[in-house]
Each structure stands twice: as structure tokens, then as C-alpha cells.
Amino acid sequence: MRVMGVDPGLTRCGLSVVESGRGRTVVALDVDVVRTPSDAPLAERLLSISDAVEHWLATHQPDVVAIERVFSQLNVTTVMGTAQAGGVVALAAAKRGIGVHFHTPSEVKAAVTGNGAANKAQVTAMVTRILALQAKPTPADAADALALAICHCWRAPMIARMARAEALAAQQRQKYKDKVDATLRAAR
């Protein structure tokens, strides 16, 4: 499975592509950071991110895109920009029919380091080790994008099992509802 990991941000948006193999084997194919000037208008910054993501999607043709889920931060401006950048990425993937999954920072940290409260240095060290990289990916946005992709590779089987279980449960609920409705109709 080929996964594009995205650490969204307006100033720096980390992009990565990894390929999963047997077991927990993951190979890094590409990583970069899209930068936009903080003094540029918002629409131009989002367009720059969109253009870069479109290029990556066309070049790498991922099976799925994993994006960091935005959570509450003290700085509303930062969280809004991060959410907007993530939305641009999700839209670009959806336009191509590519599945999008969101992972929280603690999910990513737990998947990569075993500790949902790991710091940036610990995440970077584990990403470097897992991918057998010669040097640590920099800046942190690049390491985070790789960590997101690794997290999704490792969580994808569980996500698929959950989706199948939810579909089966919905089927069973509908079957039960139909049976109750038929019984009520027959009783009238």
C-alpha cells in the first residue's frame, strides 16, 4: 500500500510518501516540506499548498492519504490555518477518488514510538530508525509527515476490520428492523 502522509500547516506543510511491505516493513519514497510566506494572502498560500499536493498526487499516485487531525490549540489563528491546509489536501485527494484518513497526534506518536505523549525528538528518532534513514528528516514537519504515513500503514488493517464490523452491524440492525416492522404489520 502506498500512503501519502501530510502534516498540514500554512507556513510549512510536510508531505511524504511511503510504501508498506510485509509485516511492519515501510519504505520511504519521498519527503518534502511546502513553504508559504506568512505575509502572503491566505488564498495564495492555500493555492500553493493545493498545487504542490496535486503534483504529489499525480507523481506518486498514493492509495490513501493520511492527514493529521487538527485538535484544539490555544492559538485560534494557527488552528484555523492548519485546518484549512488539511482541508485543501483532503479535497485534492477526494477529487481523485483517493481515500483520506485523519489521525490524531497522539495516535501517530503511539503508533511510531509506543507512547502517545512522545516529544518531537522521540518521534523523529523512531521515524529515522523505522525507515532506516541515513539522517534524521528535517524540519520536524517532514518527520511528522513520515510518521503519519507509517501510522496509517500500521493501522490500516485494523481500520479495515472496523469498517467491515460496522457494515455488518448496520446490516444486522436493518435486518432486525425489517423483522420488527413485518411483525408489527402482521399484527395489525
Swiss-Prot record:
Enzyme class, top EC level, equals: hydrolase
Q: Report any Pfam family annotated for this entry.
A: RuvC
SUPFAM superfamilies (alphabetical): Ribonuclease H-like
Q: Name one GO biological process term.
A: DNA recombination
Q: Where is the active site?
A: 7, 68, 141
* Subcellular location as annotated: Cytoplasm
Necessary cofactors: Mg(2+)
EC number(s) per entry: 3.1.21.10
Q: Please verify whether the record's keywords include DNA repair.
A: yes
Which family does the similarity line name? Answer: Belongs to the RuvC family.
Query: What's the protein name?
Result: Crossover junction endodeoxyribonuclease RuvC
Query: Species name for this entry?
Result: Mycolicibacterium paratuberculosis (strain ATCC BAA-968 / K-10)
